[in-house]
């Protein structure tokens, strides 16, 4: 006879980390970070046709202090990179980053000195969303993937250590102009 049988009906037994993961994934608030063409598709995701509010993301926040998800949509110029980083630093923990579109993920067709060749050179990215521009359905799918990632994340100091390790690895990444490979 286990504890489940002794508990009165209507009670649910769960780990605190599972409940916190469920709550976090159901109440993501994205910060407004539309930088280029992909921002149009990101805005379309907020319309009634795609209804992002069913995932707890009704309003895109203008203040980073009220947001916990940054959707970097579009190319990031060298001049905009410090601003993007500052907005990220102003977001409260826990925070997540979704890189939307090929330009945000790798610089896209803009392989030049003026565009950051992937936002992961300035921020730790949790989900990469390919496409030029990605459709709203693809963004919704990426958000659902992020929900699963959030739900299974550890709590407390373990999460902070993991986030610091990911950020350090991202900032140590080799810049694309120094990479050698098939195109070199």
Curated annotation (Swiss-Prot):
Its main location: membrane. GO terms for molecular function: 4 iron, 4 sulfur cluster binding; iron ion binding; NADH dehydrogenase (ubiquinone) activity; NADH:ubiquinone reductase (non-electrogenic) activity; quinone binding. It is an enzyme of class 7 (translocase). This is NADH-quinone oxidoreductase subunit B. NDH-1 is composed of 14 different subunits. Subunits NuoB, C, D, E, F, and G constitute the peripheral sector of the complex. It catalyses: a quinone + NADH + 5 H(+)(in) = a quinol + NAD(+) + 4 H(+)(out). The lineage of its organism: Bacteria, Bacillati, Actinomycetota, Actinomycetes, Micrococcales. Belongs to the complex I 20 kDa subunit family. Transmembrane segments: none annotated. Keywords: 4Fe-4S, Cell membrane, Iron, Iron-sulfur, Membrane, Metal-binding, NAD, Quinone, Translocase, Transport. Pfam families: Oxidored_q6. Binds 1 [4Fe-4S] cluster. The gene is nuoB. InterPro entries: NADH_UbQ_OxRdtase-like_20kDa (IPR006137), NADH_UQ_OxRdtase_20Kd_su (IPR006138). GO terms for cellular component: plasma membrane; respiratory chain complex I. GO terms for biological process: aerobic respiration; electron transport coupled proton transport. Its cofactor is [4Fe-4S] cluster. Signal peptide: none annotated. Its EC number is 7.1.1.-. NDH-1 shuttles electrons from NADH, via FMN and iron-sulfur (Fe-S) centers, to quinones in the respiratory chain. The immediate electron acceptor for the enzyme in this species is believed to be a menaquinone. Couples the redox reaction to proton translocation (for every two electrons transferred, four hydrogen ions are translocated across the cytoplasmic membrane), and thus conserves the redox energy in a proton gradient.
